[in-house]
Amino acid sequence: MRLLNSLAIAISMYSKIPVPTVDWNEKNMKYAMCFFPVVGVITGILQFGIGYALLEYTSCGKFFFAAVMSLIPVLVTGGIHLDGYADTIDAISSYGDREKKLQILKDPHTGAFAVIGLCVYFTAVLALWSEAESYMLPIAACMYPLSRALSGISVVSFHPAKNSGLLRTFQDGAQKKRVRIVLIIWACICGGIMLYLGWQQGGAFVAGAAAVIAAALLVFVYYHWM
């Protein structure tokens, strides 16, 4: 039951999927981050299912397909990651000291650099999805739990920017060593599946899957450095 409560906390926090309300107490928070990749699994399944249906059973254009695929993660998560991304772009682009960046992160207003960053993000995502074919979708679907596994590892491994806030709540409540092991297993499984699917498609796809995994790891390292 406790693990189900942890699952409910993870899904309710990082998605708009309705789940039963549970108490955010110490026992329920211990393993909540273990289930962060579950949100990615749900997103990936929706991406694969809807994307495959659009490409194989409809005559929709590339732009419509790309727009739908770009919006699915936003609708599933409620935009929580985009909100953090926009705040981070504003803070980094200020080139201020640590205190100024933290102040910008707390500011509810959206700055010019956040708008520019979001425009760049959606332009890139639209462009990438416009080139997708149905046989690419399984590998693409695995990226969502992989990214959340790496994000969860950072939560229980890296020092927080400040000593308060929602992220600190998840850090303080987690059984860090066990959660880290579970998330590493998640990441290895996702990476392994991506490489296997690439191998089934041929050598070029193995290289492509490896490149995606490498890019995710580079972002993870950059996040630690940042």
Task: State the predicted function of each range.
Residues D90:
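Carboxylate-dense, calcium-coordinating segments in secreted/extracellular and ER-lumen proteins
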Residues D83, S93-S94, Q103:
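Glycine/small-residue-rich loop that forms an oxyanion/phosphate-binding "nest" at active or ligand-binding sites
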Residues M1-G78, G96-L102, T110-M226:
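Hydrophobic alpha-helical transmembrane segments
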